[in-house]
Amino acid sequence: MNQFKVDFKEFKQALFTWKYWRMLAVLALGCFTFSSVVNGILIPHHFFAGGLTGLGLLFHDSIKEFIPFSLLYALMNIPIFIIGYREFSLKFIMTSLIGMGLYTGSLRLTEGILISINDPMLAAIFGGVIAGFTTGFYLNLGGSVGGLDIIGTVIKKRLAIPIGTVFNMVNFVVISSNAYLYDLETALYTGIFMYVFSWSMQKGQIGFSQRKSVFIISSKPEEVAENVLK
């Protein structure tokens, strides 16, 4: 109970900061952009995405007549949040729930949207760039939409399996299923989308410039500092 009070206090304090609301604004933009790519590019071209969205698209392909993808994604997140509740702070869980709600709502709002790019290669690249950058932006600010981020972290803690390995295993299943359900060419375009998305997300998260720190250990720090500053 004491820990819950501490976590609740931390979350309550975050709600009254400009930084948190800026993150939510970027998160909302990212969710809307990514859901537009899902409904406007991925579904029409039969591409799959990585992570939980990809698994959701895989299952939704056979039940799309009965349940909208937005509802399916929300249902898939329920057991994930139950598992993650004991592993993460209340602030992270609440932020992820808000993000999941924004993403689910955006998926519903953008249903039926069509981004008119007939060339599948251009569609995969364009979708990957747009979705990747906006996702990277909100991740950089501490945003989350739940999904495999939570599962990957839990598996890493309990089984010592790197998060990247978990994502790679899921993506392998998604691409293989894409090839089985459609054809190899479509699966390759899915792979291209995933690669471009991953690259763009990384750039959106850490930027194009990389900084390096160098530690100099010396018994004559004044002389070293003088020469470095010259």
Name these PLM-found stretches.
Residues 2-221:
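Core subunits and conserved enzymes of cellular information-processing
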Residues 219-230:
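Short amphipathic alpha-helix segments
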